[in-house]
Amino acid sequence: MIDQWKVIISCLTAEHAGQTDKDGKKKILSSLDMLAPKEICTETYMVVDSFPTEVEAYNLTTYLKTLFVRFLISQLAATQHLSKDKFRLVPIQDFTSSSDIDWIKPIEEIDKQLYNKYGLTDSDINFIESMIKPME
């Protein structure tokens, strides 16, 4: 793993004890970053996945920024500590250029692709968008 590109997140959620912002929304992920080959992190961070290419790591980073993914994580994140088991509702994707998702699009467009791929209704989408704060 040391010789690959890594995507890391903080092991703590962005919210203190699950509190929402003034609009009633949550960010969920407090810190999200990529590490180049030969870079490592402390146990303060969790390595979400590692890849042979920077593009795949970047695409995973983009995926984690979507409202779709962060909503799914939030369904299992009852405390402010994030662990790998909080990701079990998150569908695995292909982050290569062969993917059925166009990872080059803006995050809002990727969310729309994911909503369509998984057959979410307008009601589902409105609920997700009312609960999760956009991430840049």
Residue ranges and their predicted role:
Residues I101-E136:
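Amphipathic alpha-helical coiled-coil/heptad-repeat segments
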Residues M1-D100, N116, K133-E136:
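Polybasic, glycine- and aromatic-enriched phosphate-binding surface used to engage nucleic acids
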